[in-house]
Amino acid sequence: MKYVSTRGSAPALDFAGVTLAGLASDGGLYVPEEWPQFTAGEIAGMRGLPYADLAARIMQPFVGDSLDPHRLLELTRQAYGRFAHAAVTPLTQLDEQQWLLELFHGPTLAFKDVALQLLGLLFEE
């Protein structure tokens, strides 16, 4: 998987490159050159997966050859295993039409844990 800049003049990079680079050298954002597609069967097969396993499955096409799929799964399990709730980000029904996604079960009790616990581990790779 290659990533290209939204401004068009930075070199295309793989997942490892964009993870370390952050913003593109031309000031743009890196986006996938092509968006991965999941079939209805693949999506159905993800139903009921633990959060960490689901995260790894969805991320794998974006990661491509930058990281072995088994290693990605280990990292997602390590990152989200630190959360205080088994569902990681439980969805709680408040009433008939309102739901609340709880993003505060990470180690710092902040929404940013959902992304940054894994990102720190990816930097170490």
Where do the protein language model's features map onto the residues?
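PLP-dependent amino-acid enzyme catalytic core
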Residues: 1-125
